[in-house]
């Protein structure tokens, strides 16, 4: 049985980054979307990335991910290189082909439109997931919101997500937190999960919640597959 991939996003402090590392998170994300309340400056992100490498030289540390949305290619690549990031996540309306121009391995947020007819939306998502696989792009399944970029913090149709998971691998995102993560994993059975608002207290990333979320997510995964 493969372990569940867990992405802790919106990291803004070294303590939270260390909590994610010690909890064996698969990824930690830094948000560079200007409109996001989790925006981090490149210098601060670089400091955290280096602190992880320096303080945990003997373990497999999480892959560091920069989150961008509808930002110029030159900017995306420059920040990824400057911050020494492992990966880039595209969370806007960028076409999947945009990922071919990114200097780092790429994640792409595919958005679920809960107002669309169920069958047609499933077909659309299936086509996007197939294209992502051909381009070696990992998929994050999030909820569509025309007013929010870089993560919505809203749950979407887990039944549709479960149907998509029968044929495609992706990280489930959108409104996850310690209180619903077991239900999300048992309902959808995704490759992994992605969380930001669900590990915050008063709008700030919370090291204790990060540890609890990872533990609960992995426990739910083990319970399903054992």
Question: Language-model features: where?
Answer:
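C-terminal helical cap(s) of enzyme catalytic domains, especially alpha/beta-barrels
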Residues: 41-52, 99-101, 196, 200-226
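Conserved, mostly hydrophobic/aromatic
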Residues: 20, 88, 139, 157, ...
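Glycine-rich phosphate-binding active-site loops on the catalytic face of alpha/beta enzymes
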Residues: 25-37, 89-98, 144-145, 188-211
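Basic, often amphipathic N-terminal segments
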Residues: 1-56, 86
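Generic hydrophobic/aromatic pocket-lining and core-packing "Φ" positions
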Residues: 17, 45, 76-77, 99, ...
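Conserved anion-binding
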Residues: 32-36, 49-172
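Glycine-rich beta-strand-to-loop/alpha-helix junction loops that act as flexible
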Residues: 9, 67, 91, 173-176, ...
């Amino acid at each position: 049985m493969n372990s569940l991939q867990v992405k802790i996003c919106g990291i803004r402090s070294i303590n939270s980054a260390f909590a994610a590392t010690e909890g064996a998170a698969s990824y930690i994300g830094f948000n560079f979307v200007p409109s996001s309340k989790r925006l981090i400056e490149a210098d601060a992100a670089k400091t955290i990335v280096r602190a992880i490498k320096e303080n945990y030289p003997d373990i497999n540390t999480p892959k560091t991910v920069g989150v961008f949305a509808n930002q110029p290619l030159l900017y995306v690549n420059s920040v990824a290189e400057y911050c020494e990031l492992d990966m880039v996540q595209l969370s806007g309306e960028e076409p999947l082909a945009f990922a071919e121009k990114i200097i780092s391995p790429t994640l792409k947020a595919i958005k679920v439109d809960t107002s669309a007819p169920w069958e047609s939306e499933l077909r659309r998502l299936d086509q996007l997931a197939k294209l992502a696989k051909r381009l070696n792009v990992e998929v994050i399944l999030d909820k569509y919101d025309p007013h929010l970029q870089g993560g919505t913090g809203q749950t979407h149709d887990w039944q549709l997500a479960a149907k998509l998971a029968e044929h495609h691998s992706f990280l489930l995102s959108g409104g996850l937190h310690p209180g619903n993560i077991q239900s999300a994993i048992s309902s959808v059975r995704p490759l992994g999960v992605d969380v930001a608002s669900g590990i915050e207290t008063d709008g700030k990333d919370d090291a204790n919640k990060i540890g609890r979320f990872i533990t609960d997510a992995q426990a739910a995964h083990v319970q399903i597959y054992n």
